[in-house]
Amino acid sequence: MKRKALATMMAAAMVLSMVGCGGAKTDSTASTTTTEKTEAAATEAADSAASADATVENKDKPLCWFNRQPSSSATGELDKEALNFNGNTYYVGFDANQGAELQGQMVLDYIKKNAETIDRNGDGVIGYVLAIGDIGHNDSIARTRGVRSTLGTGVEADGTVDSTPAGTNVDGKAKVVQDATLEVDGKTYTIRELASQEMKNSAGATWDAATAGNAIGIWTASFGDQIDVVVSNNDGMGMSMFNAWAKDNKVPTFGYDANSDAVAAIGEGYGGTISQHADVQACLTLRVLRNALDGVDIDTGIGTADDAGNCLVEGEDYRYSEEDRSYYALNIAVTAENYNDFTDSTRVYDKVANQLDESKSPSKKVWLNIYNASDNFLSSTYQPLLEKYDDLLNLKVDYIGGDGQTESNITNRLGNPSEYDAFAINMVKTDNAAAYTSLLSK
């Protein structure tokens, strides 16, 4: 009992003595301050330290959902049960709405600046096509809404902009979108979503780049001279359409993720992309696990400097929603003006690039899966970043790549959870958190 009491007092003292690294704070009611998080985590950290020598059941081990937030694909409502699976469960992603608005504004700014030359056939209609990743994915929904809202082509349905694919809309008669008008230098243009579809392949995999490449071929064969702008929910699909048609025809293409190939392509005519701060996300994904395993304040090395000097700035690099137990990295627009700063998408973020002391943060084993080993962003950007941060955080991570189609392809490889100290899960579908928590609850 004396040992446990001492551990409890030491952990509490450690939490209360941490010094914040400052920076801007968000005004959102969903966001909590570093001080509030420190106080809220004090008891949790103390309890973790007190039981450090005890055998931890799988259901009580640290868990981080990432990239795909547990939620209903039909309504977008968060799965609070999954987000509160245990006291050390968190989600790490990015601020989807903020990023969606940035992408829409990036496209609009480009059109305004180049309206006279962007109208390729001079018909006064600036037509764009839209590649939709997954109609049931919150991030895809947000990006579709962001583009339509900013360009004025969105139609409200039940209080929000409809994110339903329009199909082919060359005549402007689709019900889920509308024509918008834009005046530039005294001339009025019509902005029209000529076509949009979900890029799902025959096997059921969404966000499919090959499907997007095929789609642009079909669209251009029918109304290619009317396409003035290409927009995509991500860079994987965007680059497929850019390489298949847009590059040779000098049609600006806008994506999302700031993948290395897309950033490099900006110098060749790719219009722009959005960095979702993958370096921050990857760090947070493993950092919340590291902190929980060490029994320290969850904010350590995030909004509060750790002993190595690692520290992010809340409101600049990320925001935290205490209610949702979710960390959201903030996005940055990448255009011709700044793309040279983003050419290496796998470089660790300078603010959190310091090695932890292994005597204080001993080696632990983590099971982590990527929902689709073929996903361009996750495989070429996110995982390489994770592999760099796992070294800095003294974590031995087993990386599991899924097929992008079924949860069972992943869960079948989680047959030995007792061998691991923590878990990081990237679901195929946001509805399917129970497929994983049921395994951890056995």
Tell where the protein language model's regions lie, with residue ranges.
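Sec-dependent N-terminal signal peptides of Gram-positive bacterial secreted proteins and lipoproteins
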Residues: 3-24
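A residue-level marker of the well-folded mature domains of exported/periplasmic proteins
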Residues: 21-442
